[in-house]
Regions:
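C-terminal terminal-subdomain/extension
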Residues: 1-10, 23, 83-145
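Short alpha-helix capping/helix-loop boundary micro-motifs
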Residues: 14-21
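Preference for short coil/turn "hinge" residues that link or interrupt alpha-helices
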Residues: 18, 76, 102-105
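Short, charged beta-turn/beta-strand-edge "cap" motif at the junction between a beta-strand
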Residues: 36-41
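Compact nucleic-acid interaction/catalytic patches
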Residues: 43-87
Length: 145
């Protein structure tokens, strides 16, 4: 098991919190975000700044958006949506959708084509509505109470 550096992330998190909001964020954009070190199966950032790319799914206001983290490895295709960007293959982690502050946004990568974005949105809606594809309680690592 990989050791998580919560202390280093806490220092970065403090400076992230002090940043101004990023008002230039829009739906369909792919950005590097400061994800940090998270708990359990929550997706972590990587590299020395604990960052990773994510797709902006929905912008609520200047400070708050829904994002979908990306990865280059999909373990179970039921929980990931594949897309190609800049000649590379990525997977959107459907189970990791989250609300984040625009203070976490570091640098813009680009804009996902509308046809791909519409496909991703449709997949998110279908994923949320179709609960039988959720990981079964038997595969959960957490013991039953």
């Amino acid at each position: 098991m990989t050791q998580k550096d919560f202390d280093k992330w806490n220092e970065i998190k403090k400076s992230t919190n002090d940043k101004p909001d990023n008002f230039g964020v829009h739906e369909r954009e792919i950005w590097w975000l400061s994800f940090g070190v998270n708990v359990g199966v929550e997706i972590d950032g990587k590299n020395e700044h604990f960052d990773r790319p994510a797709l902006v799914l929905r912008k609520f206001n200047r400070q708050m958006v829904w994002i979908l983290p990306t990865t280059q490895q999909a373990r179970d295709e039921r929980f990931y949506e594949k897309f190609t960007f800049g000649g590379e293959t990525f997977f959107i982690a459907l189970t990791q959708i989250r609300t984040v502050s625009t203070k976490r946004f570091l640098r813009k990568v680009g804009m996902l084509p509308l046809v791909d974005f519409d496909r991703v949105k449709a997949r998110v809606v279908a994923f949320v509505q179709k609960h039988e594809d959720s990981p079964s309680s038997e595969s959960s690592r957490r013991p039953k109470p």
